[in-house]
Design a protein with these regions (language model features):
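Short, hydrophobic alpha-helical packing/hinge segments within bilobed ligand-binding/sensory domains
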Residues: 85-91, 97, 106-107
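Bilobed "Venus flytrap"/periplasmic-binding protein-like clamshell domains
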Residues: 11-12, 30-90
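Sec/Tat-exported extracytoplasmic proteins
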Residues: 2, 7-10, 14, 39, ...
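Acidic, polar ligand-binding/catalytic clefts
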Residues: 1-48, 105-132, 244-247
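Extracytoplasmic small-molecule ligand-binding "clamshell" domains
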Residues: 1-9, 196, 209, 213, ...
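Extended ligand-binding regions for polar small-molecule ligands
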Residues: 38-43, 47, 52-53, 58-61, ...
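Ligand-binding cleft/hinge of the Venus flytrap
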Residues: 24, 62-83, 112-119, 156, ...
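Conserved C-terminal helix/tail region of periplasmic/extracytoplasmic solute-binding proteins
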Residues: 219-249
Length: 249
């Protein structure tokens, strides 16, 4: 009960959803496991990592995916298993291991913010291979269905708002829209808030204070952030991505 919601790089898996007392919300970020290497290693593909020493965290999907990938490629590797993220990074940057593997978003973050001087971010590259599906989603305690619904539909509201062109700058103007879907989303036509047990202005408040999904993505991890991650699979379905919200109706 110390934490109401965990929003981290936590992958939604069957066993986590069924056996650990969690319920997961909507997928907030479609990630995948990648590899960070120093440029001086001279490799441009994960398929060139035969015999490499790899830093990885224990008890994670990352550790299992790593073994599966190397086995599937008929390559060998030497794992350096370290529990704390800070210690993994220190081991990698000190040269104790050739490769650091985790979710690609984590690798972008590490490269942007954790490279110790005199080294620079440009001294390290993220290899092109993504070797797993890592759908990241917020986790809540199993058994509180209303709260789980609120968490889930808050994400959907941000996606639906982006799809319909509602953002933090125009949300007040959008209150005047005659589009029936926009009127439902913003609570001008009441009922959706009541169904969730929240104020009818719940979506308006999210968008006004936080922005739609695209705004949040760009600000925190996208081109408006130090990470500069391309949206990729996290584009809306209308733009070739996987992000898609059920109708708010």
């Amino acid at each position: 009960g110390e934490v109401d919601m965990l929003s981290n790089n936590t992958t939604l898996t069957l066993t986590r959803d069924t056996a650990l007392g969690f319920d997961f919300g909507a997928v907030t970020y479609y990630d995948g496991q990648g590899f960070l290497v120093p440029k001086k290693l001279g490799v441009k593909s994960a398929k060139e990592l035969n015999g490499a020493t790899v830093c990885v965290a224990p008890g994670t999907t990352t550790e299992l995916n790593l073994a599966d990938y190397f086995r599937g490629q008929k390559m060998s590797f030497k794992p350096v298993v370290i529990e704390k993220v800070e210690e993994i990074r220190a081991a990698f940057f000190s040269g104790r291991c050739d490769v650091y593997t985790t979710d690609a978003s984590g690798l972008y973050s590490t490269r942007a913010a954790n490279v110790p001087p005199p080294a620079k971010a440009d001294d390290f590259i993220i290899l092109p291979e993504i070797i797993s599906k890592e759908p990241l989603a917020p986790a809540v305690r199993h058994g509180d269905q209303q709260f789980a619904d609120i968490v889930r539909w808050s994400q959907y509201a941000m996606l639906e708002s982006e799809e319909y062109g509602i953002d933090s700058k125009n949300v007040d103007e959008m209150l005047k829209s005659e589009n029936p879907t926009i009127k439902r989303i913003l609570g001008v036509t009441p009922g959706m808030g009541k169904a969730l047990g929240v104020d009818e202005k719940w979506v308006y408040n999210i968008i006004k204070q936080v922005g739609n999904y695209g705004e949040s993505f760009e600000r925190n991890v996208g081109m408006g952030s130090p990470l500069k991650i391309d949206r990729g699979l996290n584009k809306l379905w209308t733009q070739g991505g996987l992000q898609y919200a059920p109708p708010i109706r």
